[in-house]
Amino acid sequence: MALLAIMGRPNVGKSTLFNRITKSRKAMVDDSPGVTRDRNYADAEHDGVKFSVVDTGGFSKNDPDAFVDLIHFQVNQAIEEADAIAMVFDGKDGPSPFDRDLLSVLRPLDKPIFYLVNKIDSLDMEYLMADFAELGVDKLHPVSGEHGYGVPTFLDMVVKVLPKASPKLEEDMISIGVVGRPNAGKSSLINKILGQERLLVSDTPGTTRDAVDTVCQVNGKPYLLLDTAGIRRKGKVKHKLEKFSIVRALKGLERCDVALVMLDATEGITDQDVHIAGYAEERKCGCIFLANKWDLVKDKDWALKKIKDEVRMNAKFLNYAPFMTISALTGQRVNRIFELVDKVYAQYTTRISTSKLNRMLENAITRHEPPYHKGRRLKFYYATQVSTKPPTIVCFVNHPDAVHFSYKRFLINHIREETGLDQTPIRLLFRQRDRKDLKVLKSGG
């Protein structure tokens, strides 16, 4: 798919424009300069033409932010990848030395470049564009990322110059969320997979503030990778941008099929890791525990047993989640992650026939009779699978609210034993049904 890159100094409104074009809230928007540290990708469509948009970090040579060199590296990569570029100016602030710096980088490029004066909310404000004439660019376009003024006209021009879209990747690709506390190695892992520094990597926790979607192909198969900001415990989140990032990270979990829950093997599993694993379990996505930084572990046999025991004890609610050790730095076992992802996804999308389900349920009831409710035994009528991702099964019962969690756990474990679905969450729901209309499943006794 063709790519439009949005460039500009910090706080000129690139993220607001990005959200307007992509009709999303994907890029973080805030008044603080340098909010978009990383490149943020999303798809857009205008006049029937589909294309991708990248929102880059603010470009500023004298920015005191410690990540400025990394941001410049990211901007340069985005420039290389882009089929067209939109350079954004702040219509209310007028031209700045930073704008001239970026112009000096863009002018020599043999690519379509659109110069946008942002924050022009109406025709009456277009007089503000006169200040930018001194920059000597070919044509200035008034836009308002916040209100939409001028954006359709700009997009009309963009779709005319973009190359035709290449054959579309299959839509049903596996969506993978990479989650973990700050500095667990999430971005390093994705960079190792992609073979380039798509995401900012630094020793400072919280480097990746936003979530970035990236498509990669492994053995000819497409996967959608979602890297999220590190999730801190609520009490330790002070900066409002960090809070916004955490909300976005949790929303990313809602749309991923498989979550890679990254742990720091040199530290073992922490309370924070357990909280993050809990978020993944609540959203019922497939999960894989990755103990990263394995190259730094000395006594590997002892450490492996210790961390596996810790995971199984402290995150027992994810007892179905596979566990493996990796090194994002050296690439150790990184390729094997996708083999495991495929296995988890296959179970995550499994369908069980109604007849097989009811045989299993009948066997379970025979093996362990349902408990009593107000002096009468619970009656199970029948079960059916209503959806996948994860396998979701509805059991019709005379008193659904009376099914104890321990009996529910027994039924789920029985389904796992009979189907081999030992690496996916299973959602089991209970619904009311009139017993006179349905045959009651037999129980022993």
Swiss-Prot record:
Binding site for GTP 1: 8-15, 55-59, 118-121
Single GO term (MF): ribosome binding
Highest taxon listed in the record's lineage: Bacteria
Domain EngA-type G residue range list: 2-166, 174-349
Keyword Nucleotide-binding on entry: yes
Domain KH-like: start-end pairs: 350-434
Keyword Transcription regulation included in the entry's annotation: no
Listed transmembrane segments: none
Signal peptide residues on this chain, from the entry's feature table: none
Keywords annotated in UniProt: GTP-binding, Nucleotide-binding, Repeat, Ribosome biogenesis
Protein's GO biological process: ribosome biogenesis
Binding site for GTP 2: 180-187, 227-231, 292-295
PROSITE patterns registered for this protein in UniProt: G_ENGA
InterPro entries: G_ENGA (IPR031166), GTP-bd (IPR006073), GTPase_Der (IPR016484), KH_dom-like (IPR032859), KH_dom-like_a/b (IPR015946), P-loop_NTPase (IPR027417), Small_GTP-bd (IPR005225)
Similarity section: Belongs to the TRAFAC class TrmE-Era-EngA-EngB-Septin-like GTPase superfamily. EngA (Der) GTPase family.
Role according to the record: GTPase that plays an essential role in the late steps of ribosome biogenesis.
Subunit structure, as described in the record: Associates with the 50S ribosomal subunit.
NCBIfam families tied to this protein: GTPase_EngA, small_GTP
Protein name: GTPase Der
Organism: Desulfatibacillum aliphaticivorans
